[in-house]
Amino acid sequence: MPIKHAIVHLIEKKPDGTPAMLHARDAELGDSQAIENLLADLNESYNAKNKAWGFFQGESGAYPFSGWLGDYLEGDRDFVGFSREAVEHLQKLMEESNLSTGGHILFAHYQQGMTDYLAIALLHHSEGVAVNESLEVTPSRHLDLAQLHLAARINISEWRNNKQSKQYISFIKGKGGKKVSDYFRDFIGCQEGVDSPSETRTLLKAFSDFVESEDMAEEQAREKTETLVDYATSQARIGEPMTLDALSELMDDQQPRAFYDYIRNKDYGLSPEIPADKRTLNQFRRFTGRAEGLSISFEAHLLGSRIEYDEERDTLRISSLPTQLRDQLKRRKAEQESTS
């Protein structure tokens, strides 16, 4: 993961309305194993977070970041100058947000594979302990990436090469209420373009419809479910979206376009690339059971809605039966009535 440029600035601010103080670095960080380790750990922590996805607002006085980034990429300003202008803008937005707290702000332009990224993160320290060379226990401060709450990553290559894309920016969703992280999103100038949970739910609905339409055996349906969930989870782990054509090929290498064509023909309105939402995925794994001529299999997210479990009576109540099953039951009932 080659790091092209990296720098850290410091903004001191408490969430009490006091002015923010900026301590800006005037030179890039040199190449070192430490900065490589930091960026690797940052990416690992960032990829594990729930994120929103979007694109740049139109450049304006309120959203100047994309213009500064474009100038840097065109060579009209250097990386230090770009980061300095950006962090001064962030300082102003922090002062307008009483709930915000300061920290070290990392800017890193790096390459992963053939793709260029810009990572921006607000880093905080935690107090710990260490054992020194004299074997004494001493206080120790370290960057606490487990407490990463404000960070964004811009896919520079996607932004520059795909003008229609609406998901080349990702940023961590704030847990402490929307207003806590709004200023950071406004700093980037990001407009949400893809609702990751909604897109993931729509994809899973399309998959369930596809499985039903193909009248798949239980084992085959289970295998395809695992393929979908494993692929989506692996993409979420590395911070990359799912692509419908790749997913379709993984699900059936004999008919690699089958699922993709089904989605397109049914017009689910899905984007070609979908950022996976891990919470939605975790609700999708299947419950299965087989005994004495009875076989039951259903997706976990249906429990509590279409399927209700009564532990005391040891029963399942199913509503909105699959069309094929309903038709079979109706035919059987009609046959019984005609012979009675």
From Swiss-Prot:
Keywords: Cytoplasm. GO terms for molecular function: double-stranded DNA binding; single-stranded RNA binding. InterPro entries: Nucleoid_associated_NdpA. Pfam families: NA37. Coiled coil: none annotated. The keyword Cell membrane does not apply. The keyword Ribosomal protein does not apply. It is found in: Cytoplasm, Nucleoid. GO terms for cellular component: bacterial nucleoid; cytoplasm. Belongs to the YejK family. This is Nucleoid-associated protein PSPA7_4451. The lineage of its organism: Bacteria, Pseudomonadati, Pseudomonadota, Gammaproteobacteria, Pseudomonadales.
